[in-house]
């Protein structure tokens, strides 16, 4: 994916860049695969904020994505490559020979007219989906299941992928982009290739307004707040935080503290922790 850079004709355009959308083949999504989606603005079912700095943004319809890839041994043809406002990756509309249409995540190298298929004995080609036990060691994969039949949960964002490094009994060892090495059941499915739109991380939004379009609200420093709002707040002028170490808004130590539950069951499947 190419990046389009703007000339600094205004302060908002200075250093701003956007996707050139050179891979996109249509701007009209498949209506049968669209559903309404209400923005939760970072709230849970009790109305409490669980994710800060969320809210507003433009309205958008949700595209139903086939993460399970369970339509076995039926050939599908890539009809379009489309933009999805709900994720960083592009999506591809697949027309299957039996008449069904589905969206999948668009991997790097997938083009209109290519044929894809899912199944246990599928060829090792980009966008084909099959169990990890049937994929050769060293292959790059994405959209990987953690539980058989649940659908892909790992490596779904733009430019992401994992590499199969070995097999052990009923498990396959994967190296994630973070550097983590973990076991996954060999019966879990994965899709061949790397997610496309890999230049997404190079986009510079240029101004706060573009982040607001995405539903991202401002992040206020704790030291700029009052003492009843944040442990760093209060004081005269630019006062220090007054603590031995930085704190979260809820008074717990921040930075360098491990937050993963030591009793989490999946800890036994992680061979090497991710790089810091």
Swiss-Prot record:
Region entry Disordered, spans: 221-276
Biased composition (Basic residues): 252-276
Keyword annotations from UniProtKB, A to Z: Ribonucleoprotein, Ribosomal protein, RNA-binding, rRNA-binding
MF (Gene Ontology): rRNA binding; structural constituent of ribosome; transferase activity
Pfam entry (one): Ribosomal_L2
Function: One of the primary rRNA binding proteins. Required for association of the 30S and 50S subunits to form the 70S ribosome, for tRNA binding and peptide bond formation. It has been suggested to have peptidyltransferase activity; this is somewhat controversial. Makes several contacts with the 16S rRNA in the 70S ribosome.
Subunit structure: Part of the 50S ribosomal subunit. Forms a bridge to the 30S subunit in the 70S ribosome.
Record-given protein name: Large ribosomal subunit protein uL2
Organism: Aster yellows witches'-broom phytoplasma (strain AYWB)
Gene giving rise to this polypeptide: rplB
């Amino acid at each position: 994916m190419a990046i389009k850079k703007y000339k600094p004709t205004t302060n908002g355009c200075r250093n701003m860049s956007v996707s050139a959308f050179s891979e996109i083949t249509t701007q009209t999504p498949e209506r049968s695969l669209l559903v309404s989606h209400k923005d939760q603005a970072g709230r849970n079912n009790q109305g409490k904020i669980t994710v800060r700095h969320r809210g507003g943004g433009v309205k958008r319809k949700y595209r139903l994505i086939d993460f399970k890839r369970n339509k076995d041994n039926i050939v599908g043809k890539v009809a379009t490559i489309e933009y999805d406002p709900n994720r960083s990756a592009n999506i591809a509309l697949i027309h299957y020979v039996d008449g069904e249409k589905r969206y999948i995540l668009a991997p790097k190298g997938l083009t209109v007219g290519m044929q894809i298929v899912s199944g246990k004995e599928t060829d090792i080609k980009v966008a084909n989906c099959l169990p990890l036990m049937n994929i050769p060691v060293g292959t790059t994969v994405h959209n990987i299941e953690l539980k058989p039949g649940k659908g892909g949960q790992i490596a779904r964002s733009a430019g992401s992928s994992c590499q199969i490094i070995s097999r052990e009994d009923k498990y396959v060892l994967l190296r994630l982009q973070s550097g983590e090495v973990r076991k996954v059941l060999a019966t879990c499915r994965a899709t061949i290739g790397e997610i496309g739109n890999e230049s997404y991380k190079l986009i510079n939004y240029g101004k706060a307004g573009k982040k607001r379009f995405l539903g991202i609200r401002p992040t206020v420093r704790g030291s700029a707040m009052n003492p009843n709002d944040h442990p760093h707040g209060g004081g005269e002028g630019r006062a220090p935080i007054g603590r031995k170490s930085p704190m979260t808004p809820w008074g717990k130590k921040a930075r360098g503290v491990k937050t993963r539950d030591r009793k989490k069951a999946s800890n036994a499947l992680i061979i090497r922790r991710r790089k810091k």
